[in-house]
């Protein structure tokens, strides 16, 4: 007797993109929102090729676009059209509003890929209760972005006292972010 592995198909996958103030930060010439959009498009294409259903939510201080999960070929075009017009806002993101909206719209257990960025433990602590609520009914994956320029800055040899302290501060910020991911 031989066991054969067979992938599950038609699973619901939702990409959730934060359009708040923190996503305006740039790294290597692109904003964090641009990276989130690019990642969403790649993941959407992969999900559709694997016969999974893909959906989309965007949010900031208000709710943005909502696309219900679907595995039709036109879904990628819909996602592309919605993401083309997305811009960041100058407000902090409202994770409570997101949690309520997702609980209203997503009826079955789904994979939620949340593209956001937490630069310090205080913003994470503020959002954590709502993320835990999302996790109760779904499988939540929080995707945070690495700031390559900050990493490069922390490893530079200082030429002045000011650069020395800036390097220490950059290293401290990187350590804090690393702690948040654990």
Segments predicted by a language model, with ranges:
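An amphipathic, basic-hydrophobic helix/alpha-beta surface used to engage anionic
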Residues: 1-74, 109-114, 129, 180
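Short, charged loop segments at secondary-structure junctions
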Residues: 65-94
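Conserved phosphate/pyrophosphate-binding and hydrolysis machinery centered on Walker-type P-loop NTPases
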Residues: 29, 33, 69, 92-96, ...
């Amino acid at each position: 007797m031989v066991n054969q592995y067979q992938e599950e198909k038609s699973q619901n996958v939702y990409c959730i993109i934060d359009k708040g103030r923190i996503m305006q930060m740039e790294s290597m010439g692109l904003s964090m929102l641009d990276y989130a959009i690019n990642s969403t498009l790649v993941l959407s294409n992969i999900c559709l090729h694997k016969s999974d259903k893909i959906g989309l939510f965007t949010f900031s201080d208000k709710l943005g676009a909502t696309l219900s999960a679907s595995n039709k070929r036109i879904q990628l075009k819909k996602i592309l059209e919605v993401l083309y017009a997305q811009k960041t806002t100058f407000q902090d993101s409202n994770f409570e509003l997101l949690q309520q909206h997702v609980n209203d719209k997503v009826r079955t257990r789904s994979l939620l890929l949340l593209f956001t960025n937490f630069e310090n433990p205080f913003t994470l602590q503020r959002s954590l209760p709502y993320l835990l609520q999302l996790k109760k009914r779904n499988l939540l994956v929080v995707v945070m972005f690495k700031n390559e320029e900050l990493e490069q800055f922390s490893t530079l040899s200082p030429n002045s006292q000011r650069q020395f302290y800036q390097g220490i501060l950059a290293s401290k910020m990187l350590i804090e972010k690393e702690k948040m991911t654990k």
